Amino acid sequence: MASVKLASLIVLFATLGMFLTKNVGAASCNGVCSPFEMPPCGTSACRCIPVGLFIGYCRNPSGVFLKANDEHPNLCESDADCRKKGSGNFCGHYPNPDIEYGWCFASKSEAEDFFSKITPKDLLKSVSTA
């Protein structure tokens, strides 16, 4: 009877060990993030999907992001996205090279004003010339 319990315990630990070691080295793309972190989510293997201008959640890059981008009223890749969604006329990209999308603003000056209040001045210069 003791050997059956011991064998069951060994199988349980072996199975658990297999699942735990499969994710070793893989990036954990869970939790809260900010599009202003560099890199967002602590690694460039994950994407920060904003739910607000300052806060988002980390996810693995996939088609899920594209769907979230299309559905979110303020996420954009171009000025045309903002006009199509009715969220503004200008797509102000985050001053973070790891974020390939932006946020809709009414105008370029509104975006520059907003980002100038929350980002270092030297970083803003490189963004406004892009």
Curated annotation (Swiss-Prot):
What kind of modification does the protein receive after translation?
A: The C-terminal glycine may be removed from PA1b.
Its job: PA1b binds to basic 7S globulin (BG) and stimulates its phosphorylation activity. Involved in the signal transduction system to regulate the growth and differentiation as a hormone peptide. Toxic to various insects through binding to a high affinity binding site in the insect gut.
Which branch of life, at top level?
Answer: Eukaryota
**Record's keyword annotation contains Electron transport:** no
Record flagged with keyword Disulfide bond: yes
Q: What is known of its domains?
A: The presence of a 'disulfide through disulfide knot' structurally defines this protein as a knottin.
Which keywords accompany this UniProt record?
Disulfide bond, Knottin, Seed storage protein, Signal, Storage protein, Toxin
- Give the signal peptide range: 1-26
Where along the sequence do coiled-coil regions lie? none
Q: Which residues form the propeptide in this entry?
A: 64-69, 123-130
Q: Which tissues show it? A: Major component of both the cotyledons and embryonic axes of mature seeds.
Q: Which GO terms describe its molecular function?
A: nutrient reservoir activity; toxin activity
Question: In its UniProt entry, what is this protein called?
Answer: Albumin-1 D
Entries under InterPro entries matching the protein: Albumin_I, Albumin_I_a
